[in-house]
């Protein structure tokens, strides 16, 4: 049975607990892989890695970030059939739905943000001729999100 690993600091690694959970195919009720039962130690390692990467990431240009997002979208499209099969098996949905909605949406979302970042702007507002208020949109650090959403990416 396939064993899924955590991806932390550019490496696929076992959870620190060495504990895995069966991943069940909802269409038949049978386990088809094992997923990490990650704990606080794994989260802390991921955050530590993200903070270390931030010093590099914050220096990338908008164009470089856009290019990275587009490369991710390219990778999704290049692996379309494999991702459709994985999404269908993971969620028990028809292959046709994963192929028509889920996987195209994942690459489309990345391409949307790849374009949006190039058109981001800052605002400037004059205050009664005595001051100027302005906003700058720049990376400020590591953020985490646990999204209760069942579409990929």
Please describe what each predicted stretch is.
Residues 123-153:
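Conserved small-residue-rich beta-alpha loop and adjacent elements
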Residues 86-94, 124-130:
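Short linear capping/connector segments at secondary-structure termini
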Residues 22, 34, 86, 97, ...:
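Conserved beta-strand positions that form and line the central face of beta-propeller blades
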Residues 10, 26-91:
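N-terminal alpha-helical segment of soluble enzymes
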Residues 32, 57, 110-113, 149:
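Tryptophan-centric aromatic hotspots in well-structured domains and transmembrane helices
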Residues 48, 70-80, 93-120:
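Long amphipathic alpha-helix in the N-terminal Rossmann-like dinucleotide-binding domain
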Residues 1-28:
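Hydrophobic face of amphipathic alpha-helices that form TPR/SEL1-like repeat modules
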